[in-house]
């Protein structure tokens, strides 16, 4: 199959998923072209500039494709004008709600209007979590296919031997409101350990810190199906996370991790402290989580599902 992938970036979150999926498809004999354009690196202009430039590039692209796959709403315009037999739009989380939390009312209003239009353009909509699927069904009466993003287990071989640091708690992610980093900082003085914040590290550095830690804290206010949780599962580091979005699809409380309410520094600190001293529970969580991610969230499991999804779409 011949693909055009469209994403504002090919790293982190949904962009990282787009990059990994493109690589997996290429390694399995499919052709994938990643549409890439520069965009203005100024707040509130990054996505609009990407939308304009990517749309123009898509219009003048003389190639034809079996499938144009866009990742997130800003990519939808380029998808709309792509010369492809079928078109797919993937969203990880509810776009309008994310913009509402992070930007002004005027920006949010425009984003929601664009979202409602863009959702009508593709032949198929996908998301990575049942939670996001449910919200879009309730809000827009639209059916999303759930195709979780996977982790590339081969990449973890790049991480060398790492010594565990007792009572180290780590945070991996952006320094942003929706990730709840401020909640962890409020809880930090009550945590009986050292908290390490990784907001701008290379992937290998971040994974090494996860591997060396006793706990990974995920204090998010909004999430779909966070890759950090899957990575921690694979690296045998227990996770304490908020019960928002798709996180409960990964973490079964007291089985594959610990769930706490969002926006509650005290309960977050208490859960972390309890797990730091309970080695039996920590070992149980590590074992269960590692089995779960290897059985459900690797490319060996997920790539055949993506390929079947594309093949079924083309034959429809």
Regions found by a protein language model. Give the residues of each.
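Conserved donor-binding/catalytic core segment of Leloir-type glycosyltransferases
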Residues: 162-179, 185-188
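Membrane-proximal helix-turn-helix segments that form the acceptor-binding/catalytic region
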Residues: 106-125
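Short hydrophobic beta-strand element within catalytic cores of glycosyltransferases
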Residues: 238-241
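Carbohydrate-associated surface elements
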Residues: 131, 150
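Conserved acidic donor-binding segment of nucleotide-sugar-dependent glycosyltransferases
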Residues: 253-254, 258-265, 274-280
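Active-site proximal beta-strand in glycosyltransferases
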Residues: 67-69, 82-100, 126
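A short, well-ordered alpha-helix in the C-terminal region of glycosyltransferases
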Residues: 274, 281-296, 305-308
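Aromatic "clamp/platform" in nucleotide-sugar-dependent glycosyltransferases that forms part
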Residues: 221
């Amino acid at each position: 199959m011949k693909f055009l992938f469209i994403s504002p970036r090919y790293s982190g979150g949904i962009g990282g998923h787009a990059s990994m999926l493109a690589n997996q498809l290429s390694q399995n004999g499919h052709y994938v072209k990643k549409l890439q354009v520069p965009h203005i690196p100024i707040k509130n202009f990054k996505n609009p500039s990407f939308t304009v430039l990517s749309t123009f590039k898509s219009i003048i692209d003389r190639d034809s494709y079996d499938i144009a796959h866009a990742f997130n709403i800003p990519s939808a315009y380029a998808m709309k004008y792509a010369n492809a037999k079928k078109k797919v739009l993937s969203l990880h989380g509810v776009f309008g709600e994310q913009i509402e939390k992070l930007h002004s009312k005027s920006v949010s209003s425009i984003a929601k209007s664009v979202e409602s239009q863009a959702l009508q353009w593709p032949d198929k909509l996908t998301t990575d979590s049942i939670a996001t699927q449910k919200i879009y069904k309730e809000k827009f009466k639209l059916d999303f296919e759930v195709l979780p993003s996977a982790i590339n287990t081969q990449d973890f071989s790049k991480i060398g031997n790492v010594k565990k640091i007792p009572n180290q708690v780590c945070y991996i992610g952006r320094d942003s409101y929706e990730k709840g980093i401020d909640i962890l900082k409020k809880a930090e003085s009550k945590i009986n350990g050292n908290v390490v914040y990784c907001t701008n590290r290379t992937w290998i550095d971040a994974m090494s810190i996860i591997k060396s830690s006793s706990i990974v804290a995920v204090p998010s206010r909004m999430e779909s199906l966070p890759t950090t949780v899957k990575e921690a599962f694979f690296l045998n580091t227990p996770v304490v996370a908020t019960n928002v979005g798709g996180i409960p699809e990964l973490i079964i409380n007291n089985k594959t991790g610990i769930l706490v309410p969002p926006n509650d520094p005290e309960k977050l600190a208490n859960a972390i402290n309890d797990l730091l001293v309970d080695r039996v529970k920590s070992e149980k969580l590590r074992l269960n989580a590692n089995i779960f991610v290897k059985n459900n969230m690797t490319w060996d499991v997920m790539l055949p599902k993506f390929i079947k999804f594309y093949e079924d779409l083309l034959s429809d």
